[in-house]
Design a protein with these regions (language model features):
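Outer-membrane beta-barrel domain signature
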Residues: 70-73
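Short S/T/G/P-rich N-terminal loop/turn motif that feeds into the first structured element of a domain
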Residues: 1-64, 75-93
Length: 93
């Protein structure tokens, strides 16, 4: 299962803030498991991250940790949208 997280950026030092975001992503990967890819620079928003998780429970936990850590560090990323995508096996069981 993947989660596509799109964020906008309202700061003035994207490169430095991305380093901090990388630390958050590493923390999530070690605490929750799975893998986070990105950042990507999509057409619709400033940034795109792709979260790979193996269980539905991890989906909410990864998201809560991601947004809580961003708020704690006062990073100027603003949530745009997120989308969950599953494989047929995950959907049908």
């Amino acid at each position: 299962m993947i989660i596509l997280v799109r964020l906008d950026y309202e700061g003035d030092d994207l490169q430095n803030d991305l380093k901090k975001m990388s630390e958050i992503n590493s923390k999530i990967e070690s605490k929750i498991g799975g893998k986070i890819e990105g950042p990507f620079f999509p057409q619709q928003s400033t940034l795109l991250f792709i979260f790979h998780v193996d269980k539905y429970e991890r989906l909410n936990e990864a998201g809560r940790t991601f947004y809580a850590e961003m708020a704690k560090l006062k990073l100027p990323f603003v949530p745009d949208t997120y989308e969950v995508a599953v494989t047929p096996e995950e959907f049908f069981g």
